[in-house]
From Swiss-Prot:
GO terms for biological process: cell differentiation; developmental growth; DNA repair; in utero embryonic development; negative regulation of neuron apoptotic process; neuron migration; neuron projection development; oxidative RNA demethylation. Its EC number is 1.14.11.-, 1.14.11.51, 4.2.99.18, 1.14.11.33. It comes from Mus musculus. This is Nucleic acid dioxygenase ALKBH1. GO terms for molecular function: 2-oxoglutarate-dependent dioxygenase activity; broad specificity oxidative DNA demethylase activity; chemoattractant activity; class I DNA-(apurinic or apyrimidinic site) endonuclease activity; DNA N6-methyladenine demethylase activity; ferrous iron binding; oxidative RNA demethylase activity; tRNA binding. The gene is Alkbh1. Dioxygenase that acts on nucleic acids, such as DNA and tRNA. Requires molecular oxygen, alpha-ketoglutarate and iron. A number of activities have been described for this dioxygenase, but recent results suggest that it mainly acts on tRNAs and mediates their demethylation or oxidation depending on the context and subcellular compartment. Mainly acts as a tRNA demethylase by removing N(1)-methyladenine from various tRNAs, with a preference for N(1)-methyladenine at position 58 (m1A58) present on a stem loop structure of tRNAs. It catalyses: an N(6)-methyl-2'-deoxyadenosine in DNA + 2-oxoglutarate + O2 = a 2'-deoxyadenosine in DNA + formaldehyde + succinate + CO2; 2'-deoxyribonucleotide-(2'-deoxyribose 5'-phosphate)-2'-deoxyribonucleotide-DNA = a 3'-end 2'-deoxyribonucleotide-(2,3-dehydro-2,3-deoxyribose 5'-phosphate)-DNA + a 5'-end 5'-phospho-2'-deoxyribonucleoside-DNA + H(+); a methylated nucleobase within DNA + 2-oxoglutarate + O2 = a nucleobase within DNA + formaldehyde + succinate + CO2; an N(1)-methyladenosine in tRNA + 2-oxoglutarate + O2 = an adenosine in tRNA + formaldehyde + succinate + CO2. Gene3D superfamilies: Alpha-ketoglutarate-dependent dioxygenase AlkB-like. In adult organs, highly expressed in testis, eye, brain and kidney. Monomer. Interacts with DNAJB6.
Amino acid sequence: MGKMAAAVASLATLAAEPREDAFRKLFRFYRQSRPGTADLGAVIDFSEAHLARSPKPGVPQVVRFPLNVSSVTERDAERVGLEPVSKWRAYGLEGYPGFIFIPNPFLPGCQRHWVKQCLKLYSQKPNVCNLDKHMTKEETQGLWEQSKEVLRSKEVTKRRPRSLLERLRWVTLGYHYNWDSKKYSADHYTPFPSDLAFLSEQVATACGFQGFQAEAGILNYYRLDSTLGIHVDRSELDHSKPLLSFSFGQSAIFLLGGLKRDEAPTAMFMHSGDIMVMSGFSRLLNHAVPRVLPHPDGECLPHCLETPLPAVLPSNSLVEPCSVEDWQVCATYLRTARVNMTVRQVLATGQDFPLEPVEETKRDIAADGLCHLHDPNSPVKRKRLNPNS
C-alpha cells in the first residue's frame, strides 16, 4: 500500500473509532500533523486541481464551478486588485453543493493592499477587537505605531515583548458580532469598509449572488500555533446569502464537515490569496481550522507576496500604494502568521432586526475570552465552544 493510500486508510479508521465524534478526531489529527509527511496526503490542494488526473482515494471529487464571467467587468475587478473573472479558476466538491473555492485570483502584488488594510486600517477604531477588553481606546488606537517600532526592530528575540499586532486575535466590522450572545444588533454598528465591501460584491456577483451586501466582517489573526474551533456560522438572519472568506499569509488546513459532527470532514489547504464561498447547503456546515502551516523554508513569505504592487495603479483603483516601511512591518508579521477575512450579509433586503427585550446588564462583546480563535499563549482562559454554535 502506498503512503497516500495508507494515510487515507488511517484517517478512515480514525474517524470510525467510537467515543468521540468524527470531526473532533480529525481536527485533533491535523492539529498534530507533521508538514511534509504522509499526514497531509489526503488534504486537497486546489492550487493544483487543474493538474489532477484522478481524485485521491477516499477524497471527494473536485469539479469545476462555472462562474458568471460577464457579470463583473474587467475594470471593476481591477479596481480591487483582481484578475478578470475569465481568468479565475473556480472549483466545487462533490457532496458539498454551494461550496466554491477560487485559488488566488488576485493580480500580482495586489494582495499587499489587503494585508495592509487588515493590519494597519481595519484594526483601528471604531472597529472592535479582542484587545478592547484589557486596554483603553487610546492604547488600542496606537496599535499600528506601537507594533511598527517593535516589528521593525532588528533584534528579534524570544525575550522581546510581543507587539500589540502580535496579540491581536480578531476584529469585527460593520454589524459587530457579539461573542457572548452569538448575535448581531442594530445598535452596535459602525460603517463597513467601502473597499472591502466592493471586493466582496464583485466576488459574490461572479459566483452568481447578485445584490450581495457586505454588512458584517470578522477578521481572524492567526499565529502558527493558533486554531479555529469547530463551529457553524448561523448568527446571520438571512442564510440564503453566501459567506465569503479571504486568506492571506501562511497556508492553513481547513476542515469542511457536515450538518452534524459525526460526519467526517474533508481537509483542504488554504493558501495566500485563496477565496472560499459557502452558500446553499454548504452555508451551515461545520468547519474549522486545526493547523496553520509554517513555510517549508523557515520564516519566509509565500511567493505570491514577494511581488510588489505596480508602480502605477488605475485612476479609480481602490487598491492603494503600500510604502516600503509599511510593507516591511506587514512582511515581518506574516512570516509567522496568517490573516483571514470573512464577510457576511446579515439581513435580507428590507429586513430589520427583530425586537428583543432590553437586558438589565449588558455584557462586554469585546471579551477575548469568548472568541473561538484559540491562542495557547493568551493569559485569558477561553470558554469551551458551545457544541450547538
